[in-house]
Amino acid sequence: MNEIRNNEHLTVAAVQMNSQQNIEDNLADIKAAIIDASKQGTQLVVLPENCCSMGRQFATAERFDELSNTMAEYARASGIYLLAGSLPCPYRPDGVIVPDGRLRQVSQLFAPDGMRVARYDKIHLFTATVADKQGSYNEAATFEPGTQTVVATLEANDAVYQLGMMVCFDLRFPALAQRLRQAGAELLSAPSAFTYMTGQAHWSLLLRARALDSQCMVIGAAQGGEHAYKDGSSRQTWGHATVTAYDGTIINSYEDSELKDTTNKEHKNYTLVLATLDKQAQIQGRQKMPIFDCHRLG
């Protein structure tokens, strides 16, 4: 793909991964995906939820600072903005340790110089009964919810972009997307690890709905495939990484849960879904249907 670096055009990549429990293996995949995306002209790379490890939240949290520094270095080395999916963190944004032995689910944005631009702590925690191997999910048993919405500033090609940050289950809450738009967001990041069942039912619909609610591009990075745990159990995620335009149309997507050619020695344990935000086209679309000028209940 040719580089797209015109003024007020931002090229983004939603990454689909199949993260397992081995953190070092996952980091190798993340690094390769970032280098690949950068070579294709991407300016913002969005990794999925639990990108560094699936199923080892507390062990991963012990390495939060180290892993964050690694992500910062990946961003700096490739000269891109990196939305580092999510990492479990043992402390709140003010440095206070999370009480009750819980963690925060943290999404971070790193700039091309490696500096951290923003930290968002996932507000809505997944609680559901699902007809899969696990059966029920209660994220609040492990995580404390965040309390603050976050809109971060990106600068590329002499243009400024505002990124509203979300994580996975946040997609089910239109008020968050609307509040981010009201705070100036032009695009929304949604690193996710939807279960196969809930993803099959709602993933695409939720991405399109939140795009319509906010009139923002929505970048849905995703975990996809089977994730094996040390106790012999496993979890299946939906994948289908997708980027949706402000008007709810799907710009680009990966139409599978599984990554292809897993028997090939050259197989990459990730795929990239690239898309371009045309800032002026989005502004014009919002002007043609100014829903936030008409909003009365928010």
Specify the residue positions occupied by each region the protein language model found.
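Active-site-proximal beta-strand elements of phosphoester/diester hydrolases
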Residues: 9-21, 46, 119-121, 151, ...
